[in-house]
Amino acid sequence: MLDVKLLRNNFDEVKQKLQNRGEDLGEFEKFGELDKRRRTLIVETEALKSQRNEVSQEIAKLKREKQDADAKIEEMRVVGDRIKTLDIELREIDEKLDMILMSIPNIPHESTPVGESEDDNVEIRKWGEVREFDFEPKAHWDLGTDLDILDFENAAKVTGSRFVFYKKLGARLERALINFMMDLHSNEHGYEEMLPPYMVNRASMTGTGQLPKFEEDAFLIEAEDYFLIPTAEVPVTNYHREDILKAEDLPRKYTAFSACFRSEAGSAGRDTRGLIRQHQFNKVELVQFVKPEDSYAALEKLTGNAEEVLRRLELPYRVLSMCTADLGFTAAKKYDLEVWIPSYNSYREISSCSNFESFQARRANIRFRREPGSKPEYVHTLNGSGLALGRTVAAILENYQDADGSVRIPKVLQGYMGGIEKIELPK
């Protein structure tokens, strides 16, 4: 949520930045109109209240002097009725303004590239060499099926499309990746480990920006009015909802493993095969709470923490700075990490690392005090995937495959898999 004062005092500047996002400005313009009406009503209400006080004093004086006060009493009644009417309108406008404010996205940071589509995202760097195969490489869904480690068919029978069973060494590979990532982030990168709830309430989904605008993308348990989490970012960020943190306790850095649940509304026909776009997938998340002046340096470090996973797995990747049109609702600046997937002959997103500045903190009321007794300020929140597990498995299967249909295990994972070096075709 944006600062209301920023909207009121810098309306045209904010409007331009939202235009750079490609946003429909209808709601934003409505905010300006309603806020103007609100200020007019406040001025009128204050004037009427002042008038009511004056009339009340005049009535008291007339009564003390034994004079007729009926006309003044009627005047005060009319003024009082008008104040009640204006107060009702003010409450209605405040409710509308709150709803609109919740629907306005974050404004891009000045370093975010201005663009009209994903084609305008800017490549920052690449790492690793894309492998040249001397045989026809298989897609990960075929590799997983042939190796008997991924079962999409029975998952579709048990649940539906966009689900998978991990089996045998496939399940062990995923578990190895989880442990490797959590160990790396907690032991070397300084994150505190968490295992969060997989269901959250509406206040939590609102705090991180999924609600009210993107409810159709979420899975709702109607009987309880709980949502299955789309990412561990939601429960972990809301862990500090309504908190006032101490400055000396910042930054707070958390890493959390969780299952994630997404309806993928609007994704019909896209990535229908394999692990790239599932309704349920596992992910290791990175979340930080920092002082405002530290957030952009923190974003670079957080992005580097996610990159380190790919480097140790020796998977080729690139980093993109996302343009204004591809920034997402909550971010002021965002980097995407894309890993090379041979079956797509392209890089595919495996992590997003974002600085939300105070956008989420305002919605969730997460603040800190610089000194005891000082006025609380909003923290800046950041998060990143460190990494998405399904896409990491897909990248390993495809990049580490051999001509005989087997898949080598990255060296960094072999210790987590009991020394197993290769997944071979069943005999």
From Swiss-Prot:
InterPro entries documented for this protein = aa-tRNA-synt_IIb (IPR002314), aa-tRNA-synth_II (IPR006195), aa-tRNA-synth_II/BPL/LPL (IPR045864), Ser-tRNA-ligase_type_1 (IPR002317), Ser-tRNA-synth_1_N (IPR015866), SerRS_1_N_sf (IPR042103), SerRS_core (IPR033729), tRNA-bd_arm (IPR010978)
Q: What pathway annotation does it carry? A: Aminoacyl-tRNA biosynthesis; selenocysteinyl-tRNA(Sec) biosynthesis; L-seryl-tRNA(Sec) from L-serine and tRNA(Sec): step 1/1
UniProt comment concerning the protein's domains: Consists of two distinct domains, a catalytic core and a N-terminal extension that is involved in tRNA binding.
Q: Name one GO molecular function term.
A: ATP binding
CDD domains from the xrefs? SerRS_core (cd00770)
User: Could you tell me the superkingdom of the organism this chain comes from?
Assistant: Bacteria
User: Main localization of the protein?
Assistant: cytoplasm
Protein family: Belongs to the class-II aminoacyl-tRNA synthetase family. Type-1 seryl-tRNA synthetase subfamily.
Compartment(s) where it occurs, according to its Swiss-Prot or TrEMBL record: Cytoplasm
Q: Where does L-serine bind?
A: 231-233, 285, 385
Q: Which organism was this protein described from?
A: Listeria monocytogenes serotype 4a (strain HCC23)
Listed binding positions for ATP are 262-264, 349-352
Listed under GO biological process in this entry are: selenocysteine biosynthetic process; seryl-tRNA aminoacylation
Q: What name does this protein carry? A: Serine--tRNA ligase
Could you tell me which Pfam families the record lists for this protein?
Answer: Seryl_tRNA_N, tRNA-synt_2b
Please provide the record's keywords in A-Z order: Aminoacyl-tRNA synthetase, ATP-binding, Cytoplasm, Ligase, Nucleotide-binding, Protein biosynthesis
This protein's record includes keyword Coiled coil: no
